[in-house]
Amino acid sequence: MSQQMTLSVQKREGLGKGANRKLRTAKKVPGIFYNSEGKNIPVAIDGTQLEKLYETAGKTTVFNLDIEGETAPCLIWQIERHPYKPFFTHVDLFGVDMEKPIKARIPLKITGVAKGTKIGGRMEVYRDFVDVFTKPGSMPKVIDINVSNMEMGDAVHVADLKLEDGHCIYDSNYVIVRVSAPRGGKGEEGEDA
């Protein structure tokens, strides 16, 4: 990791709905920092700074959290958005120990056009993420799946994913993506109409 990002936050005293509304009015996002020792620290975060960090880091990049001068490595664990306005309403930050593996949800990116879809098949994507057991500093941001060589009836399972050393798939072996024959359509050849 060449240069780690930093997010500055302040501890917050007021808890509850009223205090959180006041924070949001001041363009701040209420949140909780769960540190690696098990402490929960309520924090207030500048909304614009959080949005910029989330665009870059997402949920799979470790960054430094600066809480009034104390720094800790962490991940965005969960984030809540307003239902129809473009801002965050709450964030959970998870402090990590860089030497201990964690379970993380890594997004999957399907690339290419399957050969089977060019002759009428349908691409069915069953899952757009996979749970991986890995150290926080080497966590992949996304896992690419190239489907260019998939024929009709082919499928990609979790066991088919190729990961770097040190990463372990946490999930059982299920189908991620499949190219299947189109539904309905004409009957089989030789069938009377």
Curated annotation (Swiss-Prot):
Q: Which family does it belong to?
A: Belongs to the bacterial ribosomal protein bL25 family. CTC subfamily.
Report the Gene3D superfamilies cross-referenced here.
Ribosomal protein L25, beta domain, Ribosomal Protein L25, Chain P
Q: Describe its partners and assembly state.
A: Part of the 50S ribosomal subunit; part of the 5S rRNA/L5/L18/L25 subcomplex. Contacts the 5S rRNA. Binds to the 5S rRNA independently of L5 and L18.
Q: Which cysteines are joined by disulfide bonds?
A: none
The name on file for this protein is Large ribosomal subunit protein bL25
Q: Name one GO biological process term.
A: translation
Q: Name one GO molecular function term.
A: structural constituent of ribosome
- InterPro entries to which the protein is assigned, alphabetical: Rbsml_bL25/Gln-tRNA_synth_N (IPR020056), Ribosomal_bL25/Gln-tRNA_synth (IPR011035), Ribosomal_bL25_b-dom (IPR020057), Ribosomal_bL25_C (IPR037121), Ribosomal_bL25_long (IPR001021), Ribosomal_L25_dom (IPR029751), Ribosomal_uL5_bac-type (IPR020930)
Q: Which UniProt keywords apply?
A: Ribonucleoprotein, Ribosomal protein, RNA-binding, rRNA-binding
* Record function comment: This is one of the proteins that binds to the 5S RNA in the ribosome where it forms part of the central protuberance.
One GO CC term on file: cytosolic large ribosomal subunit
